Amino acid sequence: MAIDPNSKPRLAPGCRFGENNNQRVLLMPERALRLNGPSLEIVSRCDGTRTVAQIVHELQKLYAKAEPARVEQDVLGYLGLLSDQRALDFQ
């Protein structure tokens, strides 16, 4: 699935943040996904107010030492993975 840079991702119904052994996790109806580093930075921005392009830009600034194209590729790939797992909705 191609992700529209103008779409606004948010957690899908039934998905929420939680903690397990002092580790942030994304709780989904059938499983939990451990979040750390970049994955936590990406998911925490999926609040339905930021566009995909804004999220990419924020992460490019946060990881300024990394190649911007690589950051964009990683963000889009992770959003696609979460979409495939039905953890995100896009407005």
Task: Cite the ranges covered by each PLM segment.
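Long, low-complexity, charged/polar intrinsically disordered regions in eukaryotic proteins
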Residues: 1-28
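Long, charge-rich, low-complexity alpha-helical segments
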Residues: 32-91
